Amino acid sequence: MTKFNIHKPDDKLRQAIIDKIDNLNKPKGSLGRLEELALQICLIEQTLSPTLHNPCHLLFGADHGIEREGVSVSPREITWQQMINFTRGGGGVNMFCRQHGFKLRIVDVGVDYDLAMYPDIINRKIANGTGNFLYESAMSVEQYQQALNVGAEMADACFNDGSDIICIGEMGIANTSPSSIWMSLFGNIPLEECVGAGAGLDNEGIRHKYEVLNKAIENFKSSGLDCSNTENIIRYFGGFEMVAAIGAMLRAAECHLVIMVDGFIMTACAIAVSRLYPDIVDYMIFGHSGDEGGHARMLGLLGAKPLLSLGLRLGEGTGALCSFPIIDSAVRMITEMNNFQNANITKYF
């Protein structure tokens, strides 16, 4: 398996960054969370003058075999229909990318539809959806590696374009199901506390979803695989788009890019990848606490402090994109505000 070189950002500049922030012409600590963000971004980029050049949004799309079990209110074809919609600029993700100046890369990692005629969709299809993890592993070891490589390739493309920051989103009907299982297994949380409505299930739908996922976990535990192995859990239940997102996160951290994390699905990916490389969390900014059941609890498992709480549950990376102006403000604070000396203001503390 590909190994990534992930370490905490070097701390040698920490005190110099703190001193710069504290000497800006404001009361010490008065810009609160923005000061914390500025420190984090400076450490990621290893500079006292960070930038957010060429922001890039990666959107990975794929289908899930578990959808066949009726765990989602949305039909399977919504995945490919939305992928096409994104090429026409009509999705929520398109609007927020335009608003905040992000370049959008749309990547087919495993959509159950032929999208080859759409040149704005990058074709990295591994298969027409994953296997049904109620009965078998969602993907093989080889497919897992392929998906990681696709994500790393796309993060490399952003880095080579001069990006300092990437956002990652997904499109895949039924992908709250593997996310709920990852939350349960990686967080040691009872499954019933991890299963929510997804795109809009009613109480009976949630009950059915729980029963399917619970049986899938039982089958996994009797499969003969090492059920404590993180990568086994990821590939047995995960989607191609989710593993690609993990690969993108890992390569982005290697490149010292700021990683914007979205909602329930992407936070599940963050938990999964943190079990492989714990230091990666230091490269992540969590955009929001969403409305999908369990998201706030997942954020707590990571010790994350989300920037927004707007009741969002669309996915696609939209919640993270909404938080970008706050991140931008943090960078502008440390790069554009004057300090006490240059402003001829008495430093009174």
What are these regions (language model features)?
Residues 1-349:
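N-terminal loops that bind phosphate or other acidic moieties
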